[in-house]
Amino acid sequence: MTHTPVLLKEMLSLLSPQDGGIYVDATFGAGGYSKAILESADCKVYAIDRDETVTKFYDDLSVRYPDRIKLFIEKFSNIKNLLDSNNIEGIDGIVFDIGVSSMQLDNGDRGFSFLHDGPLDMSMDNSSYINASTFVNALREEEIANTIYNYGGERHSRKIARAIVNARKKKTIKTTFELADIVRSVVFRGKSKIDPATRTFQAIRIWVNDELGELEKGIKAASEILSENGKLIVVTFHSLEDRIVKTFFKDLCATDCKTFSLLNKKVIEASIEEVSANPRSRSAKLRAIQRLS
């Protein structure tokens, strides 16, 4: 499978890696950002990912760039404690590419996608006791409806929640295809190109992994460990994520002490050419700040 990093040129242009610099790729994934940073300068990259299956991508990079990259299997919300405990300092830049990766979506066994049949999991660290099965088989109808509405923007959330509860009364809901069919039984596509199950799956994934809470904690911790002139760059794919980043960056840069400055006043989005080549980039938004002192 080919992994295409989103907004790669724009990220590199803002980060501007320098020889001798120290950078953190807080969402390593398939290593697209890390690889590009290592190619751009004679620098060092510390990579973080909560999904241990990414080690196969790390192994390739560590052979190509010995002693210049190190991977930690950890949630990025723990970035400050992780780097402090390993005596890593002098951070010149931190990049985040938020959301589920293509390799997770394409692996049916992970249960992220309604396009591939598999167990209802959706856990990014592959070891959580809370997963998508917990959500559909254990939560109250009202909790299911509210989550699907709040995290997925699904206006049919109450119908979907009722259908899920009715279905689980007959038998445990076990697979992604079962769940998708339940959603499609009460929400019809009509002329829309978007599958009726899309928003529900997105909402459940966000809930399972506490993605919004992780993002809030992660970018706050990252902002605290940047060196002077260090840059924090975040790419999001969901309006709720972008709102969190936009608000946090605005608040940081609005303080009287002027510790931070916005690197891009206007949000950066993928070009028409990139969207055509990589449809995943369609909803991507990049925001960046720099520590001044």
Curated annotation (Swiss-Prot):
UniProt catalytic activity: cytidine(1402) in 16S rRNA + S-adenosyl-L-methionine = N(4)-methylcytidine(1402) in 16S rRNA + S-adenosyl-L-homocysteine + H(+)
GO cellular component: cytoplasm
Enzyme Commission no: 2.1.1.199
Keyword terms: Cytoplasm, Methyltransferase, rRNA processing, S-adenosyl-L-methionine, Transferase
Protein localization: Cytoplasm
Family: Belongs to the methyltransferase superfamily. RsmH family.
Official protein name in the record: Ribosomal RNA small subunit methyltransferase H
Gene, per the UniProt record: rsmH
